[in-house]
């Protein structure tokens, strides 16, 4: 058959051609025998039919693939497993000892859950004969090399003994479908033979008709060349070498009485007749073996010459000795027979030593000389050839001879191939030089180019997948027409040669037969060429296609003449994918009059509703049919919404934008930050006074607690507790009680509060505060209003230090010490220092300076501080001795005084709370935030240096917005392919749009950008705020966009997805939150689905068609009803982000935004997802049969074999299969390292994953399955998280967070260590052989410090270079220390 075509191998595309699809579709209508030339890709037809049978027809039935040889069975099974890796399949051949499986239980166990079996015809015929396999079990029978189904061949026995009787008795539903594959349906020249094969197989022989011209373009006819030689007369007594003549003489004069079998009969008294027969016929085991050996030796001399026969004889004797030493190779021979043969042949071998290899010793036969002469005329640079010989011995010796002959050894890399069956027969023990092991890698080496010439028996005529050859030589004439056609088909490279060696002694009639065959072949070529020329001439006919379509709104016109170009333009801008051809496919169908109608099939990323469009009319020329079909296709694309009103694709066009947002500069003028104190200033004119208690605590110590009061002219918002950092070890906590309305506050109380507020503001400062006391917010002790006056009299003002000393005031109740010589600098009292100066006591004070830092909202790393409490030790190093006469001491105790330092921080946070409250009551009223805490964080720009800023919430909001928009576009635009969805999302979530949204709703006024600077801070006054006019401020448009995302993130943190969606709707009204509704459930989802896979996913699909779509690669174009996974992968990407972000947001470890970004980047890294895809396996039971020698029988062995997730992906690209195998090989080498890093490593395995360099489809199917689960579950993220948990991603996330795994990319680490001086340059380089690799150079200060070469990707090169750089930088740092 059935090899894959060379063009397919070159292009790497499994995508079926039109003529292959024609044959596949024909096979669905009736039983057919596909007759196409060797190399035309009949395998594709079989693969399509197998897939269709498993998906849509009778998936519970068994598919049996029959091939004539064991080698071909293994090859076809390999093709099936590579292209349909999820299908459970196996081979059954003589190597499995199936002839000894004599129990039904063995067969039942072997075939249990099996979907495809590949075997020789004899295996199935014998199994059916013994009743182990029944016709009713089979859904499809595929006959490779179907021309064998004749006479008593096992293929015909299957049909005649089982298929046809069942068909007659039970009808067509009781028998399997039949698909035959052949390049030569006629074996002989009998005209009735084709009809006989069709009758035997109950099938019609078909060849492509509608797309025959395409078939001809993919098949190449070789030039037939005759090579003449004069044969050797072996009967001439002088002919032959001394060794050959000695062998012939020895055998002819052999004394049969020495034969072990005759000796055995002589010793027996019951075998007289047997002895008589043996002596008369001379047929014993040993003598018959020697006879065949002599015949082969003579044949080799005649065919190849003297050196060849000497080599054959000596090599055979050496091989015999090896077999005797290895008793396992001669189980059927007793020791006496072995010794007899060895002794007989060894005596002959003494005549002459091994044949020499000097040039003059190579005396070829005339036939070999003709062959070598022909080979010498071939082109060395492109040579790839096959030589067919009849006998196995000839094959082995000829390959050896060409490998050592002076004229050929340097030009050809030879190997022999005789197949994998027959070599173990006991009658061939002498003279059988080629073992299975010796030819195991022959074909693969030929495909790879390591060998360029194979000498083979007719085993390579049929089916075996070998590369297209430039030369095919028949060393012996083909036995029949079938062999002639099959061998000729091997020479399918362009300008190839098919040569046959002819003896000058051939009779004229024999020669005439081949001349007639050649003439018939040439006539067939000429007939095909004539038809092709007629078709080309027909295309010159003028046929007018008048179709026209106009878009009224724009005047854009579509005509048949422009449609083809528009269609190709549409396909060209679809997202490019590896292994995928986005060009539209054109096919034709014909009516009874020879007219045709075109059909265009678009790439699988296009919605199935418009993927296939058929022309509406029949045409004489292909050109006209093409135009009209393209016109209908473009018109449907427009009606489906994939072309705009200008009849252009939507990508990068305004149609993907829901609104035109216009551009914004990077820095824009926006409203000044909203000032809530202005509203409070006006409120004092008619106050509704509210008051809140402030409870101050130090280090959580209940012994130090201060109660204060905050008063305002209107309702006070709920304030969150505040943490103020006095120093590195002392922390104040401020808690705010719920505000209470205070009715009828007298004016003197207000004045007392203003005076007390001024007292607190002045207390810790050396500067005099302003005389104005009309503060918008008032502070005082937590006392009844009636006691405020007395409190003020008691605590206001100061005393001289000497007066305080004389009253012996206790230290804890003392106030701030002020040094009048230094502008009333406030000091912290430590102790009195009294000295004697004569009779006069000199009183001095030991004091400490107050801490210089005033921004207590920010945590700082400071030395141990001082707080005036009994628990705080002294610090002599900071002591200052000051004369008491130069100081005053405030009456307000220091424990109250420090509250004055808290007022600026309290009002800063109160201002932020008031702004957030106003925002929640106006713009974000519908969101219904539970508190202002999240909102304050969301509107605080990093430049404000507030206790919290929006960066963390912006990270959350970015993922929530991306996720929400992805869901909206996916649901709203089922007609959009993934490229449109991606670009549509980018248009909505771009910073420009988000910044415009912030301006549209007035969000700019609520963004906190002013930095809190306590040293420059002044208490807000009514008189000033009442006259202020709001201005403008410059602000980055990115900050506007970030705040939009951070508010979405805040809503998400406050109330989950529902509240986040409400916030999105308010800020971005064009985004409609669509419910996630899966498509209607189809009756059956066409896919080879494994029940274990469904269970292992952790989710039961309501609509399995979604899972099928999730597993359909874009290269899979044969299934016109299923879209490729790209749309689901687009959605799954957003879902994965959301699952990861949700896990981080709700984890006990709270990470900063920068670290979360790195973690998310690491977790959603395509190589990591690909690794998890390769590790995600489904256990499947596999049963095999083991021989039990002791019991003389067989035992069934069952084991669980893993089936990886990637095996279920549907693809039609040969290059993809090859790339997949390469990646899996790297996976096997890197797996242990990556697994260890994921479970135990302190660092993320960047280098190992970059070396894995997995193709994107591995990670794509993880995301597409996640998208399918999300849609099928109607948007249930918890269910999606379960799948992410099962593949191993969430457990690794938890380990990263818990163990603080370093996920920073090595390049960033290198940049950090080098302080940004490391310059990385990665380039793709191509060597002299055309092999590409990546090279990375790292320079520091213009000096190369690292060079990495030979990498598979730029990522691998950069990671390796970065790690090397890190090692150098750290080593240098250690050396400097």
UniProtKB/Swiss-Prot annotation:
Coiled coil segments of this chain: none
Binding site for Mg(2+): 1129, 1260, 1263
CDD domains found in the cross-reference section: DEXHc_dicer, RIBOc, SF2_C_dicer
Domain of life: Eukaryota
Motif (DEAH box) on chain: 144-147
Keyword Cell membrane: no
Pfam families, per the entry: DEAD, Dicer_dimer, Helicase_C, Ribonuclease_3
GO biological process, one term: defense response to virus
Similarity comment text for this entry: Belongs to the helicase family. Dicer subfamily.
Stated role: Dicer-like endonuclease involved in cleaving double-stranded RNA in the RNA interference (RNAi) pathway. Produces 21 to 25 bp dsRNAs (siRNAs) which target the selective destruction of homologous RNAs leading to sequence-specific suppression of gene expression, called post-transcriptional gene silencing (PTGS). Part of a broad host defense response against viral infection and transposons.
Full protein name: Dicer-like protein 2
Organism of provenance: Aspergillus terreus (strain NIH 2624 / FGSC A1156)
Organism lineage string: Eukaryota, Fungi, Dikarya, Ascomycota, Pezizomycotina
